[in-house]
Every structure is written in C-alpha cells, then in structure tokens.
Design a protein with these regions (language model features):
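The feature marks proteins involved in alpha-glucan
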Residues: 1-23, 49-51, 59-143, 148-154
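Conserved alpha/beta catalytic core and glycan-binding cleft of carbohydrate-active enzymes
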Residues: 105-108, 112, 281, 293-445, ...
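Conserved, mostly hydrophobic/aromatic
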Residues: 30, 80, 142, 173, ...
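C-terminal accessory region downstream of the catalytic core in glycan-modifying enzymes
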Residues: 482, 559-594
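Carbohydrate-binding surface patches
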Residues: 25-35, 514-566
Length: 674
C-alpha cells in the first residue's frame, strides 16, 4: 500500500456494492468467488497502479469483499484485481477509456472508474417526477445517439448524438404532443463488435470494426455511456441528470431501457433498477432481454416506478398501476389487418379494447427491431445487405405491403396509397385503449431503406434525418392532430378496459361493435369491415364536460362498403373528424371545422380507409332562418366549396350538395354540411 492510504476500521454496517463515500475516505465492496481480491488505484494516464490495497480476508462476507480506505482520492481511478486478473467494477458509476464512440484505437486499453464520483452531490433544484398515468401517456422512442447525430438535427455539432442534444429537442417533443421519452440503452457498453471467423463455409465472417449501435449487450448497468456525453465525454453523469431535469421541468417523463442477458445475479438487476430510479430520477425502466420480472415487479422500492416488460405472469400487481406489457402482439396483428389479411377482426377488437385495470399495455405499429412505419408500406421484404450477413439476419415476418412497388416510388397512385396506409396505421394506434408508442421519425416518414435489423448501422440508415420534416410534413401534421385528438377525448384512453355494457344505464354500452348494419357485428374470417361506437357519457373532456359520441368505421377491404350509421340522441349529428381516404385534406378535419352529416342514415367507406365520425350536439335552427340562409347563400356556397368525389358517393364540401346513389338515380340520401 502506498503512503497516504490506510485501511480504516469497519463499523459493522452493510454497504451497497461499489464505492460509498465515508468519513475520511471511501468504502469498497466487490462480489467475487476468487481466492484473493485487491483494489488498484491509478492516476488517469498511469500504466502502473499508484497503490495496491489487498482486501482483508477477515472482512469478507460470503463472496463479498469489503474494505474501507482512508485518504485523498481526488483525481484517482480504480479497478479490482481478482486472483491476479484485473477487472472493472460492474457497479462503477462512470468509466474512462470508452469516451470516444467506435474508436478502434482504444481496444485493449484500460477501462477504469473515477473514485471521486461516488461522493459528488448534484443539485436537482427541487426536481419532481410528473407521474403521468399510462392512460394519459404518449411514448416517443429514441436512440440517444441517432436522435440528433444527423447534421440536419439543428443541434450544434458538439452536442449531436448526446444527452444534451436530446435536451435541446424538448421544444420539438412538446409541440409534437408526446408525454414520455423512452431511451434505448443509455448505459456504458462496448460498442465495438470484435471480428469473428466463419464457423462454416456458408456463414459470413463478421468484418472488423462493426459496431453495436443499439446497445443490447452486457454493459455496466450503473454508468451512463460516456460517448453520449458532449465534448470529450468527461461528464456523462452530470449531462444525463441535466437532461432528466430539463425533461421534468417541461412535464415530460423519461423511461430508459436496461438490457440483461440472464447471466447476471438477480440482486444486480434489482440494484441497477433501484439505482437509476433513485440516483437519476428516471420515471421508468423497460426491461429488455432476460430479467427477474417477479423480483422487480413486487419490489416495494419500485412500486411507483413505471416498469415495462414483455409480460408479468405470476407477478402480484401493487395498488398503483406501474407495470406494463410491452411486446409485438399489437404490431403484428394490426399490420396484418392493415394490409387486408383475412380473419383479423377478432384480433382488431381485442387490441382496440385491451387495457387491463392493473397492468398497462404499450402499443406500437413500429419499433426498433423491424421496419419503420414508412418502410412498412414501402417494402415487402427486408433489405439488410448493408449488415454484411448476406441478408440472413432480421425477421422475415414483417407483415408489410409495399403498395405496388418495392422501395422508393414517384408514382402518384402508390404515394397516395402509402400516405393513406400510414394514416390508417396511426389511427389504429392512437384510437386503441392501450398506451401508444411512436418510434422516432415515424411522425415524418423516416426510412431505414428496408433494413429491419439496423443494429450495426451507425450512419444515415439509423440516424434521424430531420430534413424529412419538410418533405413529409403532411404525416407530421397528421400525427400532431391525432395525438391532440386522443388527449381531448378520454373515450379512447379510459382508465380501465371498456366493459361492452351499459353499466351506467345511459342507454348505450360504453363501447359496442357493429357490422355494415348497426348492432349486427360479423366476425367471419373473410370480412375486413367493422364499426365501433363509443358512448361519450362514459368519458370526460379536459374541461370536465361529457365527451362526444364517436363511430369509427374500419374498411380494410380493397373494395368500398356502405356502413349504416347508428342513431344519435335528439339534436345530435354526426360530423366527420377523420377520413383517411381524403388525401386532399390529409385525412383529417380541424377542430370545429368537421363537416356535418345531415339526416344521413349510411355512409360509403372507401377501400382501405378508416372514417371517424364525431356525434356532437347541434343547436336547432328555425325554419325561417334556415330558409333565408339557404336562399341568400346557395349560389355563393356552390362556388366556394370544392366537390369531393368517390366511386360510390358524390358530395360537396361543407354546406353543399347531397349524397347520391351510385345507381345513377340521383336520389338524395342526405346532405353533407359544416
């Protein structure tokens, strides 16, 4: 042991694993089955240890080595030596030697932890967690590097691809309307995939310098990744906390992904989850890989922390709804329905309604592993050639349809169909009862060029190209509108799953299913049409008033179908909130400007389209006033409003024309007005 350091007396306490600041020094705890263990102290650039302190065998508790060392640790770094082999601390809170992303020059170099960081105090300035319930959440899934790494991000160069870059985009997130940011693994891991030789003549070699861009690998689960810190990567701890504080200040939540491969001790996983909740004020953790979900799900320290996992079988939920299911079931089934597969109606109604009272549900139409939303409507097959594995990696089950051409297309018909299918997908997502999740960039047509497994693509394939905000502005506007629409109407995000019953005795069930005829739902395997009626008396608007009535008509058949419309109470009329077939209005109508259906008993829903009707109360007009207005304004309105045409119906814009039968009789079956 070097002069200036001495082993202090133990006080009999049980210390947390890793490093803990104590009076006059530091306490070190390390778990190992080895026969001997030593603490090695270094100066930052030192190659030889400044001090080697052997853990006294008498202070060993089971397989946990403990020692309190007194002295000045300023500017020093540490590792452990077990049976003569040097190893980093798995409980380390920050690491040096990994600051430069993808640098092959650091291979074989030392990876050490600063000692002093364990005792630093951060000023949270009264930070509080928003604690947004699942039914009010809209999750936005990002990669901490790829979100702002592209030059088009508008973030200054030094902050691109960093935690600070994420914080700089908070105004954009607020404008979009999301409430919660989910971040792919932000912990320290080695992104360099070591080259490997082929095991057989038919398997490709993994080339030198390949990077693990996603971060789903074993890492150091207590340290934020230094390469995601600005400048030279010296302050990842402070920058991550600054980002969290900035998000909370604007009412946004942060959920992080932690990956475990199942080889970790359950106590290590539990310690990591508790640490991020306490030390970094994260609002939730998405457990990826293999984690002891029962241990975490029933832990009292985590009972108010959002915990996301593929399933929670066998876990006893607490009083607060903090657990949530997170898997691909919604995505795969809804994509199948979207592209017109048969026998999907039962799955549609299940996912639209699914929202258990004690466990949340996370829904998405696209996520990390698979096609983006734009690629889902642009490619029939994966195109992973850039991964260097002969296109063998990644799933072959994408449930996608390219709308008539593989990859980019300039054909107007194909582009219109793709936009419509994206609008359909977004309505399916945001009108379902579970918590919607949007993958970064899907709100403005991000593409990964058909790559559905971009785990190693640290380039334009994975980085978010913000210039698409301009070229695909219609998708962006639609997403903002549908998020706002969902927030304003609680019938689409109830606290518990709809009962399909009139349990309040208001004359209608909370939610009911309909076929082409009202109150006659049909679920035959060959059908692709369904109507869903929402009774507004079971929901509240943000101002506390009763919600509106809604009728959502789904037609994923490649032919149009006429839907009978449910009757509304007296003085209520149906208004068109969304019609995904109407490309000229981007499939939506502004709040307060929804066209009204006058005395209309049915509506033709075009092929592969979704129509959302809103039942609102309309003040009755006196006949004289109506006649006077009609006489003076008839000609002016005919000239002012465009005509909207479909294969089976012809109607004019607000306050014009009638619905004409496709039979050619010209019979007026109802006027469409605003």
């Amino acid at each position: 042991m070097k002069e200036g350091f001495q082993i202090g007396r133990t006080d009999g306490r049980i210390y947390a694993m890793g490093v803990t600041a104590v009076a006059g020094g530091m306490h070190f705890s390390y778990a190992s089955k080895g026969k001997s263990c030593a603490l090695l102290l270094y100066k930052k650039e030192g190659t030889a240890p400044l001090a080697r302190i052997l853990f006294p065998d008498g202070l060993r508790t089971g397989d946990v080595w403990n020692v309190t060392v007194l002295g000045d640790f300023e500017g020093l770094f540490y590792t452990y030596e077990v049976d003569g082999k040097e190893t980093p601390d798995p409980y380390g809170r920050q690491f040096t030697g990994m600051e430069h992303w993808g640098s092959l020059g650091r291979l074989g170099g030392p990876v050490r932890c600063p000692v002093s960081g364990a005792g630093e105090i951060y000023d949270w300035e009264g930070d509080t967690l928003p604690r947004i319930p699942y039914e009010q959440c809209v999750i936005y899934h990002i990669h901490p590097r790829g979100f702002t790494r592209h030059a088009s991000s508008g973030v200054k160069q030094a902050d691109r691809g960093t935690f600070k870059g994420v914080a700089d985009k908070i105004p954009y997130l607020k404008e979009l309307g999301v409430t919660t940011v989910e971040m792919m693994p932000p912990v320290e891991f080695d992104e360099i995939i070591m080259p490997s030789h082929q095991d057989s003549p038919f398997e490709p070699e993994i080339p030198d310098g390949k990077l693990n861009y996603w971060g789903y690998t074993r890492g150091y689960s207590f340290a934020p990744k230094s390469a995601y810190s600005g400048g030279s990567g010296k302050e990842p701890v402070r920058e991550f906390k600054d980002m969290v504080k900035a998000l909370h200040r604007e009412g946004l939540e942060i959920v992080i992904e932690l990956f475990f491969d199942g080889k970790e001790a359950p106590a290590y996983v539990l310690d990591a989850a508790r640490f991020w909740a306490h030390e970094y004020h994260v609002d939730g953790i998405h457990l990826v890989g293999h984690a002891p979900v029962k241990l975490l799900g029933e832990d009292p320290y985590l009972s108010r922390l959002k915990l996301l996992a593929p399933g929670w079988d066998g876990v006893e939920p607490g009083q607060v709804k903090h657990l949530a299911e997170y898997n691909d079931g919604f995505m795969m089934d809804m994509r199948s329905f979207l592209k017109g597969d048969e026998d999907q109606l039962n799955r549609l109604v299940y996912h639209i309604r699914h929202n258990p009272q004690q466990v949340g549900v996370i829904n998405y139409m696209a996520n990390t592993n698979g096609f983006t939303l734009m690629d889902m409507v642009s490619y029939d097959i994966k195109h992973n050639e850039a991964n260097g594995e002969d296109n063998r990696d990644g799933t072959d089950y994408n449930q996608s349809w390219n709308c008539g051409a593989e990859g980019p297309s300039r054909k107007k018909r194909i582009m219109q169909m793709r936009r419509k299918q994206i609008r359909n997908a977004l309505l399916m997502l945001f009108l379902s009862q579970g918590t919607p999740l949007l993958m970064m960039g899907d709100e403005f047509g991000r593409t990964k060029k058909g790559n559905n497994n971009s785990y190693c693509q640290d380039n334009d394939i994975s980085w978010l190209n913000w210039s698409l905000l301009n070229s695909n502005s219609s998708i962006h506007e639609f997403v903002k509108h549908v998020i706002r629409f969902r927030k304003e109407h609680s019938v689409f995000h109830m606290e518990k799953e709809p009962a399909l019953m009139d349990y309040r005795c208001v004359g209608l069930p909370d939610v009911s299913y309909h076929g082409l005829k009202t109150w006659c739902p049909m679920f035959d395997r060959f059908l692709r049409q369904l109507g869903i009626l929402y009774c507004g008396k079971y929901g509240k608007k943000p101002d506390g008033r009763e919600d509106d009535y809604f009728y959502v008509a789904f037609n994923m058949h490649w032919e149009p179908h006429e839907f009978a419309l449910p009757n509304l109470p007296k003085d209520f009329k149906w208004h068109i909130a969304f019609n995904t077939d109407e490309d000229r209005v981007n499939g939506m109508y502004p709040r307060g400007g929804e066209p009204v259906l006058e005395n209309q008993k049915s509506m033709m829903i075009m092929a592969r389209a979704i129509v959302v009707l809103m039942g609102k109360e309309v003040a009755p007009l006196k006949k004289a006033a109506r006649g006077k207005a009609a006489g003076k304004g008839e000609r002016r309105e005919e000239e002012a409003h465009d005509t909207v045409r479909g294969n089976d119906t012809v109607y004019r814009g607000p306050q014009a024309g009638g619905i004409r039968s496709s039979s050619g009789t010209g019979q007026n079956t109802g006027a469409l007005q605003s």
